[in-house]
Amino acid sequence: MPKRRARVTRKTKETDIAIELVLDGNGKYEIQSGIRFLDHMLESFSKHSRIDIALTCTGDVDVDDHHSIEDIAIVLGSAISQALGDKRGIQRYGWAIIPMDESLARAAIDLSGRSYLFFDAVFDRPTVSDLSTEMVEHFFFSLAEHLKANIHLEILHGKNTHHKVEALFKSLAVAMREAVKITSNEVLSTKGVI
């Protein structure tokens, strides 16, 4: 079976982004988002989802991190959606509970073709390194919107903000790895389409 791949670009007055990914990869990554902590989170997402990701972003981070973070989530969601094609044979659902030291995150995803985000996490710090923690929820919202998926994310407990954010990214990565897995040759929907 050929590997499922996608390439997406997005150029606005605020950002210039290119992404190439392979769903059936090994978790290889080359990520340059312009936001060091986001690089770390996307590298973790790639490694634990086993999705190969090459991403570059030039953005107006001198103004704020909002535009780059939002647009990266848009291209990541669009690229995964493109690589999934008609979603024939995918498991469709995935879930994971992942610890990161004292923090515990739960993720569930349905690649349903319908966008929705449930997010329950509280961060005690306004930033982790150069990432605004208020943008974590917005990243996942934009990802769900452009992936056309139901994503549920929550921190069950935790103290360290870095650990909470990383546990969210890793739990979604493991859930995604399960959801994109090919398990049959049928579309997993009574409608016949997803």
UniProtKB/Swiss-Prot annotation:
Alphabetically, the GO molecular function entries are: imidazoleglycerol-phosphate dehydratase activity
The name this protein goes by in its record? Imidazoleglycerol-phosphate dehydratase
Q: What are the BP-aspect GO terms?
A: L-histidine biosynthetic process
**UniProt keyword Amino-acid biosynthesis present:** yes
Q: Which UniProt keywords apply?
A: Amino-acid biosynthesis, Cytoplasm, Histidine biosynthesis, Lyase
Question: What pathway is this protein said to act in by its record?
Answer: Amino-acid biosynthesis; L-histidine biosynthesis; L-histidine from 5-phospho-alpha-D-ribose 1-diphosphate: step 6/9
Report whether Cell membrane shows up as a keyword of the record: no
Name the gene for this chain: hisB
This enzyme's EC code(s) = 4.2.1.19
What reactions does this protein catalyze? D-erythro-1-(imidazol-4-yl)glycerol 3-phosphate = 3-(imidazol-4-yl)-2-oxopropyl phosphate + H2O
A Pfam family that this protein carries is IGPD
UniProt lists the family membership as follows: Belongs to the imidazoleglycerol-phosphate dehydratase family.
> Which GO cellular component does the record give, naming just one?
cytoplasm
